[in-house]
Amino acid sequence: GNEDKLDEAPDPAAFVRGVPAATAPGSAYRYNSLGSYIAGRVVENASGARLDDFAAKALFAPLGITRWSWGRDVANHPKGQGNLSLRARDTAKIGQMVLDDGVVDGKRVIDTSWLQAALAPRVATGAVDRYADSYGYFWYAKTQDIGGQQIAVYFASGNGGNKIYVIP
């Protein structure tokens, strides 16, 4: 699909700009790696730092994540759509931080309002994804019956079946 073409494009951002939208934003769920790539570039532009450098300072260091690698595109930008390698224990740290409302060791790492916005349902997915009811900012949600209670379960899903589940 387009992700393979993105990886081969001499100018990945220009390639993304040239792909027409299949639907209006927010109107239908259609996961697309191109949007994730552009989100990474937006972070770079907003922060003034490479995506991996920003993540290292703002997220990985506060979580104690010291071993990771992130693949780069031909323009030498970290691939916002994936290729981030973390140890299982480090993905668990991200999940625990989300469970703890963005706080790690008593220190706020992610703003509460941003985390709530990321987890909020933005588009329904149930018609095309039986494992999720909705998708937010890179997080899925599914209401599960757990012990007779309806509980919202949140999860991030990566290539190759990698997942982070957060069950409040």
Residue ranges and their predicted role:
Residues 13, 17, 40-44, 55-56, ...:
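Non-transmembrane alpha-helical segments in soluble domains
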Residues 1-82:
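Catalytic-site signature segments of enzymes, centered on catalytic residues
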Residues 70-79, 101-126:
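A beta-strand-loop signature enriched in Asp, Gly, Thr, and Trp
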Residues 81-95, 114-128, 150-153:
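...with weaker cross-activation on analogous glycine-rich loops/strands in unrelated enzymes
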Residues 35-42, 80-103, 162-168:
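Active-site-proximal alpha-helical segments within enzyme catalytic domains
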Residues 119-167:
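Active-site Gly/Thr loop motif
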Residues 75-86, 135, 139-142:
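Carbohydrate-binding/catalytic loop surfaces
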